Design a protein with these regions (language model features):
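N-terminal small/polar loop signature for handling phosphorylated ligands or for N-terminal nucleophile
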Residues: 1-39, 142-197
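Active-site nucleophile and cofactor-binding loops and adjacent substrate-binding regions
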Residues: 5-12, 208-213, 240-242
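Short Gly/Thr/Asp-enriched flexible loops that form oxyanion-binding sites at enzyme active sites
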Residues: 39-45, 194-212
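Gly/Ser/Thr-enriched, mixed-charge loops and adjacent short helices
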Residues: 40-172, 178
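Gly/Ser/Thr-rich active-site loops/lids in small-molecule metabolic enzymes
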Residues: 53, 206-224
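Conserved phosphate-handling catalytic cores of large alpha/beta enzymes
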Residues: 228
C-alpha cells in the first residue's frame, strides 16, 4: 500500500484535503481530538475527503476482527519502505494548496481587510499554529498575539487538561491574554484543529465565549450580507441546516 505521510504534525482539515488533492483511496489521522491526554483516537476519511460513514466503519472493523494483529499484519522496515517508494513524504506544496483553497472561500470579494483588528490566538498545544497564523497573515491580518504557553505541540496539555475550545476552562489563558492586549477577538483551535472557540468583547469590555450556534448564525449573516452587497447572492437562495453529522448534507443554491 502506497502511503503519503506528513513529515510533521498537521491538522485534521489538511489530512482531509490531502486525501482528495493527492487522489488517495483513504486518509487516516491518529488523534484524540479535543479530549484529555490519556485518550487517543483514529479518524478515517474516504477518497472524497469526508469521514467514513457508520456503515463503512463497521465494515472496516469487521475486517480488522478477522485478523491476528501479530501474525496477519504485514510489516516492513520504515526506512526500507521510504527507499522503495512505498512511503512518500508530503511536500509543503500541499499545505500551500490547502491554505490557498481556504483563502478562496473568502467573501470579501476584493475588499481590504481591517488590518487594525487585534487577534489573540491559541492552538491549545496542538497542530493549528502554522496553518492558522499563516492563513490569517496571508489574508492581511497582522496584529496577532499568540498565547505563548500554548503555541507549541504538547500532548500532555500542561496548561489545559481538557483542550476543548468551546468551554471556558480551556479558554482561560487566552482570555487573560485578550484582556492584557485589549484584543478585539480571541480564537482558539482544539489540538487537531477541526474545532474553534471564539470570544468577543462586549459593550462592557468583557469577553464572551460564543456558542457554536451563535458563531454559525453570525457567519451566515455575514456571508449573506456580503453576497448581497456585491451582487453575488443567487436567485431564490435556500439555507439547509444539518443537525447531526449523520443527516442530509447541507446545501444551498
Amino acid at each position: 500500500i502506497k502511503v503519503n505521510l506528513w513529515p510533521r504534525l498537521n491538522p485534521v482539515p489538511t489530512v482531509s484535503f490531502a486525501t482528495r488533492y493527492l487522489h488517495a483511496s483513504a486518509g487516516v489521522m491518529v488523534t484524540a481530538s479535543h479530549n484529555p491526554s490519556k485518550y487517543n483516537g483514529y479518524k478515517v476519511y474516504g477518497a472524497d475527503g469526508c469521514q467514513i460513514t457508520t456503515e463503512a466503519a463497521a465494515a472496516v472493523l469487521a475486517e480488522i476482527e478477522k485478523l491476528d494483529i501479530f501474525a496477519d499484519v504485514k510489516k516492513m522496515d520504515f526506512d526500507e519502505a521510504v527507499k522503495e517508494g512505498k512511503i512518500e513524504y508530503i511536500s509543503d506544496d500541499v499545505l500551500t494548496a490547502f491554505i490557498e483553497k481556504v483563502k478562496s472561500q473568502s467573501v470579501l470579494f476584493g475588499e481590504e481587510v481591517n488590518k487594525n483588528v487585534s487577534i489573540v490566538y491559541s492552538p491549545l498545544n496542538g497542530t493549528g499554529y502554522i496553518p492558522v497564523t499563516r492563513t490569517l497573515e496571508e489574508m492581511g491580518y497582522t496584529n496577532i498575539t499568540i498565547v505563548e504557553e500554548q503555541r507549541l505541540p504538547d500532548g500532555n496539555f500542561p496548561t489545559c487538561p481538557y483542550p476543548n475550545p468551546e468551554i471556558k476552562e480551556a479558554m482561560a489563558l487566552g482570555m487573560d491574554y485578550a484582556k492584557r492586549n485589549n484584543a478585539d477577538l480571541l480564537l482558539a483551535t482544539d489540538p487537531d484543529c477541526d474545532r474553534v472557540g471564539i470570544a468577543v468583547k462586549d459593550k462592557n469590555g468583557d469577553y464572551q465565549l460564543l456558542t457554536g450556534n451563535q458563531t454559525g448564525m453570525l457567519l451566515f449573516d455575514y456571508i449573506c450580507s456580503q453576497r448581497t452587497k456585491h451582487n453575488r447572492m443567487p436567485a431564490d437562495p435556500v439555507m439547509a441546516v444539518s443537525y447531526t453529522h449523520l443527516t442530509l448534507p447541507t446545501n444551498s443554491r
